[in-house]
Amino acid sequence: MQLHKEIIDLRSDTVTKPCSKMLEAMMSAEVGDDVFNEDPTVKELQNKTAELFGMEDALFCTSGTMTNQLAIKAHTQPGEELICDQNSHIYHYESAGIAFNSGVQSKLIQGDRGRITAQQIEQAINPDQDWLAKTSLVCLENTVNKAGGS
């Protein structure tokens, strides 16, 4: 019996390559302008995702980084602060997007291989003082690559 060895590289969406069947599916997909809500494939994906999560609507994003940055922007105001693990992707690998896109500062917590506790979060929340940034968001990642993938 011959074993078939195939390596699937899941390090990042930037290192994956579509196979011929994927390319064929892309080339034959019915498309439209998403800005005008005319792309049936995107609409179907968003509708299925919204239904899956029991939500009114969903938004398709082209990358995890884009999704992270949109979520931060939606949940914060400029001058506020978010809390995240010191090894988090949003802090190390998203080109200072937190500060650039949202005008938000980061408070880093030293977790245990990417895991931070409720007690650590509670201790990191700024008190309600005019001279301190309001803590408005806690960002948790699953998994934290830089922390060993835990």
Which residue ranges define each predicted feature?
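PLP-dependent aminotransferase-class I/II
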Residues: S102-S150
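Conserved core of the PLP fold type I
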Residues: E56-T76, I109-G111, N142
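Solvent-exposed alpha-helices and their adjacent loops that cap or buttress functional pockets
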Residues: Q2-L3, A50-F53, A74-H75, A99-N101, ...
